[in-house]
Amino acid sequence: MSKPVLKASDITDELRDEIFELSSNATANYKLEREIAAYIKKQLDVSQGETWHVIVGKNFGSYVTHEKGYFVYFYIGPLAFLVFKTA
């Protein structure tokens, strides 16, 4: 299994590590990108409070607004992950 490769972030190291762990678990247990994203979002909503947004895929563009300190963009293998929280 590939390790996460960080591309951009505005997040604490602790929260980044939690998201990396959740994402690695999700890719090991689910095949569909939608299922991977749903797992990560549901876990973060419970552990960090709502309202999280998770986008997972091989090809997408984005332009989002996020809460300060709650944004991370990274890859695991060929999959890109965009994870952020809004108020």
UniProtKB/Swiss-Prot annotation:
Compartment(s) of residence: Cytoplasm, Cytoskeleton; Nucleus, Nuclear pore complex
Gene3D superfamilies: Protein Inhibitor Of Neuronal Nitric Oxide Synthase
SUPFAM superfamilies hit by this protein: DLC
Domain of life of the source: Eukaryota
Zinc as UniProt keyword: no
Key words, A-Z: Cytoplasm, Cytoskeleton, Dynein, Microtubule, Motor protein, mRNA transport, Nuclear pore complex, Nucleus, Protein transport, Translocation, Transport
Protein name listed in UniProt: Dynein light chain 1, cytoplasmic
GO cellular component terms, semicolon-separated: cytoplasm; cytoplasmic dynein complex; microtubule; nuclear pore
